[in-house]
Amino acid sequence: MAKNNQSAKARMGAIGESLVVAKLMQQGWDAFNANCTIKNYKSIDIICLNSDLREDGDLRWKPKTALVQVKTCNQKNIPIGFTMEQTQDIKYLEDNVKGPYVLIYREEKDGGSKYRFFVISRKDFIKLAYELHHWYIHDWEREKPLVLSAPAGFPIKNLMGEDEKETSRHKAFHNPFKGITFEDKWENIWKE
């Protein structure tokens, strides 16, 4: 990737993270960017605190904390930060998905940008990553073998709760979240 493309991609990511911090604060929650102190902190972009909720057990004195990962993209299949092979290892996902995800689709319209936010809990992220990519790996007819080290992504239609219909190239994908949209579901920040 050319240096200017890397800069543009980094800028888009920084814009997405800043927009998410603002959205979280609009909900009445405290939030800050973890990347302000460590460049591209692994698996965590934003730390969010909700003083109205408390942690469980011995930590009930502490405000509820969410470790949020943000992915921003201008494609309708948003990369999720894992390879297709990694999505098929539930233990790996459980160890590496630290909290909820906010996936942002940036669309260029009328000379400006419009942003759509998809907020998915940690548990739902793991379930969708596994099931969607299991289907993509095993239920497609291909002339060439699939490269499992390729990036995995979530198509917007699946984040909107839509299935994939059967075609001559693949079986149908039955979305485990059929009819449930993750768009603007900020309350998912606090769900496991």
Across the structure, where does each feature detected by a protein language model lie?
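Mixed-charge (Asp/Glu-Lys/Arg
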Residues: 1-42, 47-192
